[in-house]
């Protein structure tokens, strides 16, 4: 059985968001750094710091929460893993789905790197659909 790092970071972020934690610590790899850069650029997280313990690198994410009068915290986003090691899902640039009419984003792994659905449509490249975020 292999380790699915993308599912691990999605689960860590989702669990921290549901438990109203302010920060999440995830392992740093090239894939996780690319996904976190997209989340930061799209405004789903507030801040990212790189932390080094012994020989391992970690990313510390500061999540974005919204205060509400009725509820103390409201979760901002939902994450869903689409393509997984047992069942890969691919799409070309014309068939990439729009999440909530363009409000959400799709993160793809293409031949030109990891990017959002909007960037993939502009560059006219398809790839493996990693996750949906809305």
Swiss-Prot record:
Domain of life from the UniProt record: Eukaryota
Subcellular location: Plastid, Chloroplast
Gene Ontology biological process: translation
Alphabetical UniProt keywords: Chloroplast, Plastid, Ribonucleoprotein, Ribosomal protein, RNA-binding, rRNA-binding
InterPro entries, alphabetized: Ribosomal_uS8 (IPR000630), Ribosomal_uS8_CS (IPR047863), Ribosomal_uS8_sf (IPR035987)
A Pfam family matched in the record: Ribosomal_S8
Listed GO MF terms: rRNA binding; structural constituent of ribosome
A single GO cellular-component term on record: ribosome
NCBIfam families: PRK00136.1
Reported function: One of the primary rRNA binding proteins, it binds directly to 16S rRNA central domain where it helps coordinate assembly of the platform of the 30S subunit.
Quaternary state and interactors: Part of the 30S ribosomal subunit.
Similarity field: Belongs to the universal ribosomal protein uS8 family.
Listed name of the protein: Small ribosomal subunit protein uS8c
Gene label: rps8
């Amino acid at each position: 059985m292999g380790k699915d790092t993308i599912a691990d970071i999605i689960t860590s972020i989702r669990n921290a968001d549901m438990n109203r934690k302010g920060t999440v610590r995830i392992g740093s790899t090239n894939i996780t750094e690319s996904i976190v850069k997209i989340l930061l650029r799209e405004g789903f997280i507030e801040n990212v710091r790189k932390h080094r313990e012994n020989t391992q690198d970690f990313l510390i994410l500061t999540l974005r929460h919204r205060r509400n009068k009725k509820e103390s915290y409201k979760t901002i986003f939902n994450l869903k893993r689409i393509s997984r090691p047992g069942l890969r899902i691919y799409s070309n640039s014309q068939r990439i789905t729009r999440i909530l009419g363009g409000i959400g984003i799709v993160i793809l792994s293409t031949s030109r790197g990891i990017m959002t659905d909007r960037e993939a449509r502009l560059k006219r490249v398809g790839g493996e659909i990693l996750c949906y975020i809305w």
